[in-house]
Amino acid sequence: MIDLTGRTVMITGASRGIGAEAARIFAKAGANVALVARSADSIANLAGEIGTSAVAIPCDISRYWEVAQAVENCVTAFGGLDILINNAGVIEPIARMDEADPEGWGQVIDINLKGVFHGMRAALPVMENAGGGTILTVSSGAAHGPVEAWSHYCASKAGAAMLTMCLHKEMGDKGIRAMGLSPGTVATQMQREIKASGINPVSQLEWSDHIPADWPAKALLWMCGTEADAFLGEEISLRDEGIRKKVGLV
């Protein structure tokens, strides 16, 4: 396991699923963990589970000032910020474009796309001053192709993937390591919401078809090591058996 003793990671969407598993795994690797999510009770409970190396920071990532404050709180708690994991994301309301609620559609963009930018923008000055850092964004296969009734999700994930590429282009030579992770379908609450919609082929998958949340969490940890430097500015797919072997999943 990669040793992150003395390093600090901030994880958005840390209240459940991939984010919560990443928090546990990064803490086991020795990192200080800043848990960011709207669900204050959930992240407080998780921080209590992890112990003194974790701090809960309630935050709505769709609001930049809250994200900036979260970064400030993280730095106050642990003295810096070495790794940012943009994990928070939503998929509801699932609807075809001719029936989609414009406000709900826009809220997905606010969280999945603007939230990623907000995290990057708030973290970068801290990382630049420290001489570098790592920014990882949880992506999706939906970033690369259309899925029925997911126009909001596909558009937001495509935009977030482009942010990773732009960040690498602008800051890669300044010590900022930027990468995306496309985990495939993961056994989380989001898949329950997709299943309930019954609209597209993804909703027809069985629970056993999805990978456990600790797989992408372990991949995110691996991406913090030098072995992943070959993928800087790119998106890594956990559907790739070669990547699964590198991460130690198979």
Name what the model sees in each region.
Residues G180-P183, T188, S197-K246:
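C-terminal helical subdomain
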Residues M120, S156:
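Active-site helix of classical SDR
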Residues G145, C166-I176:
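Active-site-adjacent segment of SDR/Rossmann-fold oxidoreductases
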Residues P58-Q69, P102:
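The beta1-alpha1 cofactor-binding region of Rossmann-like NAD(H)/NADP(H)-dependent oxidoreductases
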Residues A95-M97, G104-G106:
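Substrate-binding pocket helix/loop in short-chain dehydrogenase/reductase
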Residues S15-R16:
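Conserved glycine-rich cofactor-binding loop
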Residues S140:
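Residue(s) in the substrate-gating loop at a strand-loop-helix junction
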